[in-house]
Amino acid sequence: MPTTPIPFTPLHMFRRLLCVGLFLFAGIHTTLGATLPLPSTSYKYTVLDQDLSAALQEFGNNLKISVNISAEVKGRIRGRIPELSPREFLDRLTDLYDLQWYYDGVVLYVSAAKEAQTRMLVLSSVHFSAFKLALDKLDISDERYPVRPAPGNGLVLVSGPPRFIALIEQTLNGLLAVAQAQPRATDTPARESVMVLFRGSSTTVVRGGRPEVFYTSEMLPENDDGGKAELSKK
């Protein structure tokens, strides 16, 4: 029977993103993608005529791995399968029956290749480098399913099995939520500076760093008493 998917709650995603920040701060490097814990010894499996889903489920049971098998995985295994390592056995079945598999660190998801999805994601305020790094640190990245940025880093094209796409979208939503929760600095308009420069009999008014008015002693405007007005620094 298919295993029920384990969803990421917002709190779970926030905690994992917080761990990403700690990894970045500490400069710790991790391996890309969650590692499927399979032994290197040969996997002995004898089958003459068995349902494909049942064989995959038994594969997980024998190796103590939770397996989620899509209802679209159909077919029967007929004939002898050579003795292979567990990873080679899994890859052989996916090649023969046009399947895809993805391991999220908890559950091995097996789906039909026709279920693969393609998404164009809008990064908004999140930079692609930060998005890709979060995928790497959360062990979501998988070299079989690349994440490709569009020119300008505003869009990302992703393709892969449903579980992989779901984690990609959840990660982006988590990063956007963290970015929106951060306080934004308010822009304070700069005060315009006004200076009056005196050089001999000439006077220059400088406003905002630009000379604006030039006076000589003969050009100063008269005050109400008929005398020359005086300029002062503001």
Curated annotation (Swiss-Prot):
GO cellular component, one term: membrane
Keywords: Membrane, Nodulation, Plasmid, Transmembrane, Transmembrane helix
Keyword Isomerase among UniProt keywords: no
Subcellular location as annotated: Membrane
Transmembrane segments: 17-36
Membrane topology: Single-pass membrane protein
Keyword Kinase: no
InterPro entries the UniProt entry points to: NolW-like, NolW-like_sf
Major subcellular site: membrane
UniProt function note: Regulates cultivar-specific nodulation of soybean.
Protein name, as recorded: Nodulation protein NolW
Natural source organism: Rhizobium fredii
